[in-house]
UniProtKB/Swiss-Prot annotation:
The gene is RIOX1. It is an enzyme of class 1 (oxidoreductase). Residues 294-439 form the JmjC domain. This is Ribosomal oxygenase 1. Residues 1-35, 54-80 are annotated as: Disordered. Its cofactor is Fe(2+). GO terms for cellular component: nucleolus; nucleoplasm; nucleus. It is found in: Nucleus, Nucleolus; Nucleus, Nucleoplasm.
């Protein structure tokens, strides 16, 4: 409590002559008054420029250059690709995605490919079965290949991961060259490289992930509610994300350890067995276990695979929560894991082969949106599945926390899929769990009613043995508790706890992926090097005329702690979860308003000379510190002295 309360101190910034009356129990920077005249002028300027920016034809999630053509809520309009309305059943026109029943399915029919894909079988639960709605996929649009977020070396299906497990910090691959293949993934990654805003890149990649379903429909009606199947009939959709060749290369070239990075498991006769030998997972051991019928689960593939890391690093900004992943390789005619439910929102991306999935609704209300993962269930514990389907490469399956699931390979075909996970312990309850103890402590310090003693005889009428008592003293006691609990909201340090959770998210996050533009205009692109016995191209400096903005939108958070202001950031994070300690910079009180302006104005540029500081020295000191740490980019490349 002391730490969070103390966090409010430095946020009431300014030198002693400008000290304001304390604002108890708020740790939020944004909740505090700014220097009104100067900061408001800057924000008005920023707002007007951002409005002008929206009218330009830059790629965005709503522009022709970057959006996915997807079905509108009203299927009475023309469908993407010129499909006639008559191709959709009347019922589907009334309810574009079918009845919101046990599961939701979407089938995309590519313009140039027709693959035989097993239909999903829906088993009625407590609600009517969902209808399969056929939605033509958007026509393929050719994207220029001169600027790739992930270039050929990182995206080729047969290429090694190439990144050590301890790699940290933002990275860009500039090896150049043309991939030997093309895929929807490659095209969307090339498109992301052309979008200037990291938030718009995250929205665009999520739109691609669940296409052709509109994201607003997904979040409004399905997120945390229903299982969703997207049937694409395009085996190349995820090509280049991860492959069995990538896994084999990792086993040969990386320090993959059993238990830490790789699990070998099988599910036989209703029992799961984990068969992890000690030590490194060399190819001989791993593939022998696979041949013996074990599924191989690669934990945290983003630590080894550049492409998976880039994929997750972009999406984590969409969720506002850590995005993780596992990769599962299952041999033919086998099942690796027992039925269970997880404590994460799961997106299953089928990469290779086929796999039969069965998904079940939570059995009881306490399992809905589960806070912890379940133990293994037996088949006798399960009812009828709400969704039973065979996933083909390119298909997507989503199910919320608490949905029981199991999967097996059949018909002599192996399966490789990646599960993208997010929203672990990111609930209202977790937020309140952090707030309430602090609110009680603050209330006891500031309100005498919380310090008054309990009735001397309260044990005579309170407790389980008196729960059926009609004693009026019991009624009065319960009413007093309700009144005090209602008052706690006035003392809840909501902003301070929000800042602490944001700080935790910064520490959980993967390091950012840089576009070509971000690299060229930041410290990562400076041409400083060692040549002929000395460093050359040294001396780039910011001036008051330099225009800057944050490198990306979600890479930093300003938090007050222990009477000081700290800017926590992600650019030095590791791809291995919490391998590095949290990284931060101290921000001086006279620079706090300027720091807030930079955080709030992204992606608009701000002149260094317009930063609301007391002196030019403070302006240049803040901007230079942020630039040198890789947190700022400039509108134009810096001139070298």
């Amino acid at each position: 409590m002391d730490g969070l309360q103390a966090s409010a101190g430095p946020l009431r910034r300014g030198r002693p002559k400008r000290r304001r009356k304390p604002q108890p129990h708020s740790g939020s920077v944004l909740a505090l008054p700014l220097r009104s005249r100067k900061i408001r002028k800057q924000l008005r300027s920023v707002v007007s420029r951002m409005a002008a920016l929206r009218t330009q034809t830059l790629p965005s999630e709503n522009s022709e250059e970057s959006r996915v053509e997807s079905t509108a809520d009203d299927l009475g309009d023309a469908l993407p690709g010129g499909a006639a309305v008559a191709a959709v059943p009347d019922a589907a026109r009334r309810e574009p995605y079918g009845h919101l029943g046990p599961a939701e399915l979407l089938e995309a029919s590519p313009a140039a490919r027709s693959l035989q894909t097993p239909s999903a079988r829906l088993v009625p639960a407590s609600a009517p079965p969902a209808r399969l709605v056929e939605v033509p996929a958007a026509p393929v649009r050719v994207v220029e290949t001169s600027a790739l977020l992930c270039t050929a070396q990182h995206l080729a299906a047969v290429q090694s991961s190439g990144a050590p497990a301890t790699a940290s910090g933002p990275q860009v691959d500039n090896t150049g060259g043309e991939p030997a293949w093309d895929s929807p993934l490659r095209r969307v990654l090339a498109e992301l490289n052309r979008i200037p805003s990291s938030r718009r890149r995250a929205a665009r990649l999520f739109e691609w992930l669940i296409a052709p379903m509109p994201p607003d429909h997904f979040y409004r009606r399905l997120w945390e509610r229903e299982a969703v199947l997207v049937r694409r009939q395009d085996h190349t959709y995820y090509q280049g994300l991860f492959s069995t060749a990538d896994l084999d290369s990792m086993l040969r070239n990386e320090e993959v350890q059993f238990g830490q990075h790789l699990d070998a498991a099988r599910y036989i006769n209703g029992r799961r067995e984990t068969l992890n030998p000690p030590g490194r997972a060399l190819p001989a051991a791993a593939w022998s276990l696979y041949q013996a019928g074990c599924s191989l689960r690669l934990l945290c593939p983003q630590a080894f695979s550049t492409t998976v890391w880039q994929f997750l690093a972009v999406l984590q900004e969409q969720f506002g929560s850590m995005a993780g992943s596992n990769v599962y390789l299952t041999p033919p005619n086998s099942q690796g894991f027992a039925p269970h439910y997880d404590d994460i929102e799961a997106f299953v991306l089928q990469l290779e082969g086929r796999k039969l999935w069965r998904v079940y609704r939570p059995r009881v209300p306490t399992e809905e949106l589960a806070l912890t993962s379940s133990p293994n269930f037996s088949q006798d514990d399960l009812g009828e599945p709400v969704l039973q389907t065979v996933l083909e490469p390119g298909d997507l399956l989503y199910f919320p926390r608490g949905f029981i699931h199991q999967a097996e390979c059949q018909d002599g075909v192996h399966s490789l899929h990646l599960t993208l996970s997010t929203y672990q312990r990111n609930t209202w309850g977790d937020f309140l769990e952090a707030i309430l103890p602090l609110a009680v402590q603050a209330a006891m310090e500031e309100n005498v009613e919380f310090r008054r003693g309990l009735p001397r005889d309260f044990m005579d009428y309170m407790g389980a043995q008196h729960s059926d008592s009609k004693d009026p003293r019991r009624t009065a006691f319960m009413e007093k508790v309700r009144v005090l609990v209602a008052r706690l909201g006035h003392f809840a340090p909501v902003d301070a706890v929000a800042d602490q959770r944001a700080k935790d998210f910064i520490h959980d996050s993967l390091p950012p992926v840089l576009t070509d533009r971000e690299r060229a205009l930041s410290v990562y692109g400076l041409p400083i090097r060692w040549e002929a016995g000395e460093p050359v191209n040294v001396g780039a400096q910011l001036t008051t005329e330099t225009e800057v903005h944050m490198l990306q939108d979600g890479i930093a958070r300003l938090v007050g702690e222990g009477g000081h202001l700290f800017l926590y950031y992600t650019v030095e994070n590791s791809r291995v979860y919490h391998l590095e300690e949290p990284k931060c910079l101290e921000i001086y009180p006279q620079q706090a308003d300027a720091m807030e302006l930079l955080l709030g104005s992204y992606p608009e540029f701000v002149r260094v000379g317009d930063l609301p500081c007391d002196s030019v020295e403070d302006q240049l000191s803040l901007a230079t510190t942020l630039y040198d740490k890789g947190l700022l980019l400039t509108k134009m490349p810096l001139a070298l002295n």
